[in-house]
Amino acid sequence: MTQPTRPSVTCDQGSSTIGGTAAQATTSSSATSGSNYQRDRLGRRPEIGVGGQPQICFPRPRSAQQPVLFSLMNSSEAAMKKTLPKSHLSRVIIHDNRITQRIYEMEVSALEKTKKKISHYYEHLKKKFMTEQLRKLGRWREESVNSNRYLTFGIPPPV
């Protein structure tokens, strides 16, 4: 008692068309002309089973259409995101932006502190200059008063 041989079933990895399975499901002895037609049409060799057994080949199931990536990224970032979907690229970019923002804020605060210091130093130098000028002016007045006493020759100064 021999059991009838069952046809082998495989999954066609490269085929995305369903029309290629009809000629492959028939036996090789009865469909040589159909197989040649199929080979010429699709550019493949016909599948020949071992011992003349029919071989049934199913195409891979089609997946749902790929979702379109929509973002405000430029194309290179979008391509990087598409090729590395499980990467933490967005987190890295956000982290890098935070670090850059922090550095920028530190530079701005340091610049503001420097401006304040320079402003205070400028005010200090201006005040020092003015006091020195007032001191000189006062000393010149005293000297001029003292020298005018000797130069008056008895003429009283105007009142």
Curated annotation (Swiss-Prot):
Organism domain of life: Eukaryota
Positions of region (Disordered): 1-57
Pfam family, one: DUF5528
Comp. bias regions, Polar residues: 1-13
Bias-annotated ranges (Low complexity): 14-35
Biased composition (Basic and acidic residues): 38-47
Database matches in PANTHER family: SIMILAR TO RIKEN CDNA 4921536K21
Protein name, entry field: Uncharacterized protein C5orf52
Organism lineage: Eukaryota, Metazoa, Chordata, Craniata, Vertebrata
